Amino acid sequence: MNIDAIAVDIDGTITDNKRRLCYSAMEAIRKAEDAGVPTIIVTGNIVTYAYATLVLLGASGGVVGENGGVIFKENYNNNQIKTVVDRTYVNAADKHLKERLGSKFDKNISNDNMYRLTESVFYKTITKKELEEGLKGFEYLDKIELYDSGFALHVTDKRVNKGSSLKYLCNENGIDMENVMAMGDSENDEAFLKEAGMKVAVGNAEDFLKKNSDYVCKNNYGDGVKEAIEKFVL
């Protein structure tokens, strides 16, 4: 299989358990870029954070941010951030959660929520089960998704995910998904891994992701990313 593009998550994949960018991943991604294979950042993070990571890596494939809610790539869409969905259902979910959880809502919602265009994020000082309980009785429960990224909990619009937006960005740029190698570590990475021709789980990935991957790295975090790029791309 020819790999024409790499799609990779940030937290827990190209960063370690302290959220530090792994030099090994950076080095491998730059070598792939030099060989003509671009890297796309696919993350639950805000698009500005993701784009900064893209620049630091020396990558050129663009960004899928907020679990698929936003897309950005230089020289695409007039260099404007493309918002795939609005916050209608997410805002309604926030209102419902605030009414149900009270002060617990304010204490646990992420400080970067003001920068998010399509989703809401909560620190893991609150559990997924507590948020699920808080969402009981929500009128539009079938319109939203609750993800655990390993570092935070995300309330997103069900119409999009990392996979659908990665596929859209690749199609817009003439890249066949069968020739994409996707790498991740957690629950919210499943959606974009299953769209790719080559599915890779880094060594520290959750078990269910490993079971549904074509290749499981022997190494963790960025060392796993380097391992996969050297094996399948370079």
Swiss-Prot record:
Enumerate the catalysed reactions: 2-phosphoglycolate + H2O = glycolate + phosphate
Q: Which one of the record's GO molecular function terms can you name?
A: magnesium ion binding
Listed GO cellular component terms?
A: cytosol
Q: Kindly list the positions annotated as binding Mg(2+).
A: D9, D11, D185, D189
**Could you tell me which InterPro entries the record lists for this protein?**
HAD-like_sf (IPR036412), HAD-SF_hydro_IIB (IPR006379), HAD_sf (IPR023214), PGPase (IPR006382)
Q: Where does substrate bind?
A: K162
Enzyme Commission code: 3.1.3.18
Instruction: Give the EC class as a word.
Output: hydrolase
UniProt KW Magnesium keyword: yes
Q: Which domain of life is it from?
A: Archaea
- The active site of this protein is located at D9 (nucleophile)
Keyword line: Carbohydrate metabolism, Hydrolase, Magnesium, Metal-binding
- Cofactor(s) named in the record: Mg(2+)
UniProt lists the family membership as follows: Belongs to the archaeal SPP-like hydrolase family.
So what does this one do? Answer: Catalyzes the dephosphorylation of 2-phosphoglycolate.
The protein depicted here goes by the name Phosphoglycolate phosphatase
